[in-house]
Structures are given as C-alpha cells and as structure tokens.
C-alpha cells in the first residue's frame, strides 16, 4: 500500500483528517495511481486550494498479484473483505490521525477496483459512507455468473450474493450512503452495468450522481473522474 499525507499533517500531526481508500484495476498496482493517475499532483493541487488540508489517501492492493482477482471477497482465494474492512482501517487508526466519523471515510476505485468500492460500501455502510465507482462492473465476475460462482466463490451462490452489490442494494436500505458513478463516454462494455447500479442504488436510498468523461476504459477518464470527485468528497467530509 501507499499512503499520501497532506501538507497540513506535517504542520499539525495530531489534527484528525478524512480518509480515502483507493484501489486500482486488474492488472494494476497501487503505483499506477501515482504515475498514470497523477495522484500526488492532484492531491497537492487540491491541498493548495484548501489551506494545506486534504484527505489522507491509502492506495491499497486488493489483488495480491498481477493476474489474480479474488473479487474483493473473503473466499478460499483470499480474505480481501477482511483486509479492506478491518485490516486497513485498523492500521490507519493505529498509525495516523484519521477521523473516527464514518462520514469522513470514503472508498474509491477504477474498473474492478470500482466494483470493490461498491462491494465494500454495501457490505460495510457503517464504515465507509462515500464512494467513487469509476468504470466498475455491476457484479463481481470472472466471466459469466456460473463460472464466477464456481471459480470465485467456492461454488456457493449464497457467498456470491453476500458480495454482490446489486443483490445487497436490492435487499437493504442505504440512506446514509452516497457516491459518484462515472465512466468514459465510449466505454460501452461497462456503461450498461453502471446504469444498472445507478437504478438499483437509488431505489435502496443511496444518493447517487452519474458523470461521464471523454474517452474509454482508460486512465484519461479515471484521473479526471477522481480529480472531479474530490470537491464532492470534500463537501461530504466537511472540509
């Protein structure tokens, strides 16, 4: 994982700050957000506009390798849900001055990382209240649903549904949760699923915005979407 600390942290290391947990797609690594996503430049520019204050960013690896996709879940392939919902928050609270208010915690990701962000928000709404889903899928998947359940969820439909955000939003209420769903205008392969998420999320009580950007399934879209989402998150955080 990689952690970004805003300038205000170095002036007052005890002042509590909001948190964004950020994920790449697959294949991808946390470093991609630094190089391809221009995260340091984006955050420094944001901090300069807010008297040095900005969220703490933890860019985490939810895959473990360049080829694996454990579907952001606790299965025989790994304990990714535990990592993102327990281990990462516990480390941040123990080592950095992060806010204890779930309203100041957000999770964000691109492609399968965007899917993961929505999975986490729907599984743990009392931990992360805000999210950015950039070009994510509607469901965790390794091809079709049958293969996904067989290979990704140990053959258990119950386990699949417990980690499928569309299923969870169809059966639960999320009035305290809010997010932005975004995609590239020419990203036709992902657009349909994101529109499905929008409809189901609004019915669950979530406050949802949809935003589109010129481009396809690319860093051009994701870096713009993240930068564009920061003011919205800052408002949610009360920065």
Question: Where are the predicted features?
Answer:
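Non-catalytic cap/lid and distal C-terminal segments of serine-dependent acyl enzymes
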Residues: 1-239
């Amino acid at each position: 994982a990689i952690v970004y600390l805003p300038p205000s942290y170095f002036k007052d290391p005890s002042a509590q700050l909001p948190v964004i947990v950020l994920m790449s797609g697959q294949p991808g690594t946390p470093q991609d957000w630094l190089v391809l996503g221009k995260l340091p430049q984006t955050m420094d520019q944001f901090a300069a506009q807010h008297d040095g204050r900005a969220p703490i960013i933890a860019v985490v690896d939810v895959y473990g390798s360049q080829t694996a996709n454990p579907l952001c879940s606790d299965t025989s392939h790994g304990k990714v849900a535990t990592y993102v919902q327990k281990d990462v928050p516990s480390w941040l609270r123990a080592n950095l001055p992060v806010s204890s208010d779930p309203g100041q915690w957000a999770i964000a990701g691109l492609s399968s990382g965007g899917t993961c962000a929505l999975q986490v928000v729907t599984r743990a709404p009392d931990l992360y209240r805000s999210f950015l889903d950039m070009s994510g899928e509607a469901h965790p998947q390794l091809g079709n649903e049958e293969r996904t359940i067989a290979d990704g969820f140990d053959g258990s439909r119950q386990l699949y549904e417990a980690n499928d955000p569309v299923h969870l939003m169809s059966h639960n209420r999320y009035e305290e949760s809010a997010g932005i769903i975004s995609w590239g205008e020419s990203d036709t392969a992902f657009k349909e699923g994101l529109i499905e998420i929008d409809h189901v999320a609004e019915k669950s009580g979530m406050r949802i915005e949809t935003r589109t950007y010129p481009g396809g399934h690319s860093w051009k879209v994701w870096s713009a979407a993240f930068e564009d989402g920061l003011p919205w998150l800052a408002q949610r955080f009360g920065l």
